[in-house]
Amino acid sequence: MIPEALRKQALIAYKHGLRATRVAFDGDNRVLLAARAEMRKGMENPDSSKTTQEQIQHLEEVATFLKRNLVQGQKIEGEEKYHLKIHKDIELGDNESIKQPTKFKARPFKKCSDN
């Protein structure tokens, strides 16, 4: 039997997951229903190799990922372009980390014949 406190945490995580799917898959009912069915299946038949706390943490991480990092696109008819559905919760990076030089230098290329 799962303690009441963990049951409440699991229910809260499940609700967060449902909300995240609504945000991430808004307007795409097929994917929304599939994601929710998968989430429900995970709640009804949890992975026995993980503790309840680990499962709750995983569900919270999935919900956060869906809400902040998943962007859906829809092809614009007659064009080779897509309209991205970016909402207020999406993390928008500034690409500053890409501009920073790496601290590792590339090794010189060595041929087999150099032996």
Curated annotation (Swiss-Prot):
Compositionally biased intervals (Basic residues): 102-115
UniProt keyword annotation of Transit peptide present: yes
Annotated keywords: Chaperone, Mitochondrion, Transit peptide
Subcellular location: Mitochondrion matrix
Residue span of region Disordered: 96-115
InterPro entries named in the record: Complex1_LYR_LYRM7, MZM1/LYRM7
GO terms of biological process kind: mitochondrial respiratory chain complex III assembly
GO cellular component labels: mitochondrial matrix
Domain of life: Eukaryota
Gene Ontology terms, MF aspect: protein folding chaperone
Task of the protein: Assembly factor required for Rieske Fe-S protein RIP1 incorporation into the cytochrome b-c1 (CIII) complex. Functions as a chaperone, binding to this subunit within the mitochondrial matrix and stabilizing it prior to its translocation and insertion into the late CIII dimeric intermediate within the mitochondrial inner membrane. Modulates the mitochondrial matrix zinc pool.
Assembly: Interacts with RIP1.
Similarity comment: Belongs to the complex I LYR family. MZM1 subfamily.
Name used for this protein in its record: Mitochondrial zinc maintenance protein 1, mitochondrial
